[in-house]
Amino acid sequence: MDHKLNLKKQFACIYTSDFFSGLRITDAVWVALLAARGFSLWEIGLAESVYHIVSLFCEVPSGMAADLLGRKKTLVSGGVCMVLQSLLMAFASDLFTICFAMGLNALAMTMFSGTTTALLYDSLKQEGCEEKYIQVSANGSQISMLANAVGSMASILNQFLGYAGFYLLNAAFGGISALANLLLAEPIVTESQASREKHPLHALPEQFRQLVRDSLHVLHTCPMAGKLIASSALISVPSYLTKMFLQQRLVELGWPTELLFLPLLLGGLACVAGTEVGRRVRCRSMRRLYSACALLCGVGTLLVGAAPAWGGILGMMLVQGVLEVYLLHESQKLNDAIPSDQRATLISVDGMAYSLLMIPASPLVGAVGDAFGQAGAGLALLGGAIMLSGVALLGKKPQRS
C-alpha cells in the first residue's frame, strides 16, 4: 500500500481529542445532580440500565461500522452524539428524555471504544512502526486520564454552574473533541480499506455479513484473541463498581457533593501512574501478568468494600492503577493478533464481553450488600472472585508471547 501519513499531525489530533473528551465534568456528580432535581434512585438506576443495554447492543455494530465505513467517520459521529446527549441532559425535564440522552451517551461511547484503538494502531502500522503502540497509547491514556481528573474537580463549582451549566460545558468540550477528530487522516493498510469509498450503499448488507463471517473465523482460528478478550472483560468488572459504590459509601458517611471529586481525582492520578508503570513493564507472559494484576485488583476491591473511607479510596486507586498496567499490554497483544480489516469489530467484541459481565454483576453486587446489610459485602465477594481467577492461572504453564 503506497499511502503516506503525517504521524505528527495524527498524534496531535488524537491527543487533542483525548484531552477534551476526557474532560467529562459530569462523571463525578451526575447522580447527585439528578437526585437534586427530584429524580428518585430507581429512576436514576433505570437511566443507568438504559446506558448498559444500549452499550451491549451497539458495541459490535459500531465497530463493524468503523471497519466498513471508516474509523474517522465513526469517531466524528460519536462526537456529534456526545454533544447532543449533553444538550439533552442540560434541558431535560422528564425521565424519558434523561433515558434517551443516556442512550445517546452509550452509543457515542461504543463508537469511540474500539474505533480509537483501531485508528491509532493502523496509523502506526501504515508507517511500519507498530512497536510504538504501547508508548503512543500510554501517552493518549495519560492525557485522557489527567483531563478526566481535572474535569472531576468541577464538582467544586456546583454552586456556580448549576445543573444546566455542567452539561452545557460538557457539550462545548465534546464539540472541540469532535472537531479534532474531523482533522484526522483515515489510515489505509489494506486494499479493502483503500476501496471503501467505491462500494455502493446497496452492497453494505453483504459486506456486514462477510465481516461477521471473517470476524468469527478470526476468533475460531486465533484462540489467543478469545483468551485476551475474556481476561480483560473479567478483570475490568471492579473498575466501575468500585468507583460507584465508593461514591455511595462516601455520601452515606456524610461527604458533601463538593468533595466527591476527590476520589475520582485520586483514581485518575492512579490511572496515570499505572499507565506509566505499564509502559515500563516488559511483558514476557500474559498469563503471569494477569495473575499478578488479578490478585492486586481483588485486594483493592476488598478494601473498597470493607475498609474505612480512606482505605476504600486507596483500594479504588489500586484497582484503577493495576488495571491500566494489564489493559495496556492486553490491547497491544490483541491488536498484534487480529487483522486490520476486522480490527475495530473485534476490539468491540472486547467491550461487549465487558458489558455482558457488567449487566448481572452490578445488581448482584448490590443484592449481596442488601442481603448482608452491608454495602461492601458484594464488593468483598467480587474481590474474592477476581483473586481466585488470578490464583487459578498461577499453577499453569506460562504462555510466552
Residue ranges and their predicted role:
Residues 19, 85, 96-112, 311-326:
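Hydrophobic core of transmembrane alpha-helices in multi-pass small-molecule transporters
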Residues 1-8, 186-229:
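Juxtamembrane intracellular "pre-TM" segments in multi-pass secondary transporters
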Residues 80-94, 98, 295-308:
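C-terminal ends and interior cores of transmembrane alpha-helices
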Residues 56-93:
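Conserved MFS/SLC helix-loop-helix module at the cytosolic interface between two early adjacent transmembrane helices
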Residues 48, 72, 163, 244-401:
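C-terminal transmembrane bundle of multi-pass solute transporters/carriers
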Residues 103-145:
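Cytoplasmic helix-loop-helix junction between adjacent transmembrane helices
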Residues 2-57, 222-265:
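Helix-loop boundary and gating motifs at the non-cytosolic
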